[in-house]
A protein has these predicted regions:
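Flexible, compositionally biased loop and terminal segments
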Residues: 1-210
Length: 210
């Protein structure tokens, strides 16, 4: 449980690192739709820590000009957490200095499925025709509709898999994997990732320029 506690507290440090380095958007994968399969006591502990985090951090985030967003199926969370999320998002909605997305009860497949269902309803009602559906329109139905696609995905813990995270959005995202686990991840590792990323050539399906 200590790892979970430190991991949640680590969020504040990484937000500050991003701010110091001029990065304006950060998304952290906190709890997946599949994490409900974990032992009930562990899930309860995690949810209590998320709730405590919201109580402790949101006012300070607002003072720093941070816009807080939660992406995921919020309706499955407890009424108490949902209430705190609504307050936090409402309080910080106008902030533009930094955007922090917390992926909570999130799944990339679930996000795409939700988008497809919403589009299907629009077509069924006659408000949208199939011919209008393209990549640009589809993006508008994602949880991250108002945000650019990620430039860099950092995977801690040495795992070489995406774990159902932002499946649509990371089509051309660069990956950086570190054996360091999230509770121990800090500014040093973040800078290593950025330095590696800075030397890459992003081709978006094109060819390398010599």
């Amino acid at each position: 449980m200590e790892g979970h506690r430190v991991g949640i507290e680590k969020i504040r440090e990484i937000i500050q690192v991003c701010s110091d380095l001029g990065i304006r958007i950060l998304t952290i994968y906190a709890f997946s739709c599949q994490n409900w399969k974990r032992p009930s006591w562990e899930v309860s502990f995690l949810m209590s820590r998320f709730e405590a985090y919201l109580n402790k951090e949101i006012d300070e985030m607002n003072k720093k000009g941070i816009r807080f967003q939660v992406i995921g199926r919020r309706e499955s969370l407890s009424a108490s957490i949902q209430k705190k999320i609504r307050r936090a998002m409402s309080l910080t909605r106008g902030n533009e200095d930094f955007i922090f997305n917390l992926a909570l009860n999130y799944g990339g497949q679930e996000e795409i499925l939700d988008a497809v269902k919403e589009i299907a309803q629009e077509v069924k009602k006659g408000d949208l025709s199939p011919e209008e559906i393209d990549l640009t329109l589809f993006k508008r139905y994602l949880y991250t509709d108002d945000l650019p696609y990620p430039d860099l995905l950092i995977r801690t813990g040495g795992e070489y898999r995406v774990s159902n995270f932002l499946l649509w959005q990371i089509a051309y995202t660069e990956f950086w994997v570190t054996p360091i686990f999230w509770p121990d991840f800090g500014k040093k590792e973040f800078i290593e990732a950025l330095e590696d990323y800075a030397h890459r050539e992003r081709r978006f399906g094109g060819i390398r320029e010599d």
